[in-house]
Amino acid sequence: RARRPSRSSPGFDPTAVRGTPPPDWKPGPVTGMRKACFRMQADGHNLEVTVIPAGGDLLANVNRWRGQLKLEPLDQQQLIDSSLDVKAGNLDGKYIVIPGASETILAAIFPEAGGGSWFVKLRGDSKIAELQQEAFRAFVSSLRFSPSFQ
C-alpha cells in the first residue's frame, strides 16, 4: 500500500513540495535552493535525488548536465527526440535519461507559467541509476509543487 504524502515528510521543504519517496531512499539535507533531497546506497555506490526550482530553459540545463558527465551537447531536435512526457500534479513536463560512462542522470523538468521550472534530478552510478528508473518515475509522478515563480 502506497504511503500518503505528508506535509512534514523528512527530506522535503513542506512549503515548496511534497511527494512519496521509495522506502529505500533516505532524507538528505534540504538547504538553500534544494526543496527536497533524498539519498540511497547500493553496492557501495551513492545516488542523490534533488528537487530545485530555478530558471533556465530545458535545453540549456540538459546540456549543462551532459557537460557534467563529459558528454557532447544536444541540439533542440535531439532533445525532443530523447525526452518523454511526464506529469506531476497539474504540471506537464519532460523526462530525460542522460547516460554517462560511469554516472547517469535521470531528470524531470516542469516549467511553470511564471517563467521558472522545477528540476527533479537523480544522479549516481549508471548501473544503480538504471535499476532506480521505475522508482524515480513513480517519485516524480507523486510530486506536488507549490507555485514558486508566480
Where are the model-predicted features located?
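Surface-exposed amphipathic alpha-helical segments
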Residues: 16-25, 68-69, 115-150
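N-terminal "mature-domain start" segment
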Residues: 1-35, 76-77, 144, 150
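Signature of long, low-cysteine stretches enriched in small and polar/charged residues
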Residues: 27, 33-35, 63-113
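A mature extracytoplasmic/lumenal domain signature
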Residues: 21-23, 31, 42, 53-55, ...
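Coil-to-beta-strand transition motifs
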Residues: 44-46, 102, 113-117
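Solvent-exposed, acidic/flexible segments
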Residues: 14, 18, 31, 54-58, ...
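Secretory pathway targeting signatures of secreted, lumenal, and periplasmic proteins
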Residues: 15-68
